[in-house]
Amino acid sequence: MTFHFHAFLGDIDDRLYQAEIAVTSDWHLPRRGFPATSKQMTKQSFTLDQQAESERIAKRIARAGICSRREAEARILDGRVTVNGEMISSPALNVGARDKITIDGKPLPGREPAGLWRYYKPRGLVVSDRDEQNRETIFDHLPQDLPRLMTVGRLDLDSEGLLLMTNDGDLARHLELPSTGWSRKYRVRAQGQINESQLAALADGVTIDGIRYGQVIAKLDRQMASNAWLTVAIREGKNREIRRIMEYLGHKVSRLIRISYGPFQLGDLEDGAIEQVKARVLADQLGLGDSTLEASEKPTLSINKPAYKSGAKRGRNANHSGKPSRGNPHKTGRR
């Protein structure tokens, strides 16, 4: 299957050209790269355990879509969680289906069926449920009728493209693990003339300021007078990994678009739009076979793009009527 992502990509002189990026489901990396595609790898099984009679309380909270398991443990240690009317101070507690749990005085909602969404994260939005600098976040622009969502990994303020979101904390953690074997691919605009031999050397990894970055597969797509477009694939996704590696090679990244995360593609998703992954597709990619997952197959939801341009003043109350509470994204590395 081939998806096409249409975008206007500008060079450093602001000359625009129409580009069509073909993203195929089996094009994960060039030959000199990771040894197998996701289809060739053994799928990492993910068990939902929807009918578990007893489980750790942090796991129960995460599966209710409130927050990640780690954040649930922190809330327990802060004394914000009660079980059957008693405040608990340790996450080392198993709870059953009949136990009554509250967080900050509010009853824990029933567990929703696990779902996954593809979201085109626009540039200029923070991937967080709240921002100390009062900048707008992705949650300020999500439709109100979505369930409580958290992100799978992050993208930094100036990055854009595919961001996976889920209502299940355990699923989010599972998809972030390097053991899934999934690569993340990006279209990268970098300033200057690109040395292809330097790109090839990244396949062996690189150490920058004491930080070891694993295998990076980078391919030059188009060299222009003042900048170039590349396709870059990574697996670890450390904090600002691609930007730091390109700066190490002497090139500043002026645009970064994630086009895939494992088998999930940006495809023709429009800037600011969100679309739920079909339950059977999600089940297949998680190795569940005949899935017990339930998910409504809603059409793509278009989101009002932020009505600001680079350098414009932005505020939490700009261009939206209110901020939904969606849960806390994981604090993993940004790209």
Predicted regions and their residues:
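Short hydrophobic alpha-helical segments enriched in small aliphatic residues
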Residues: 5-7, 14
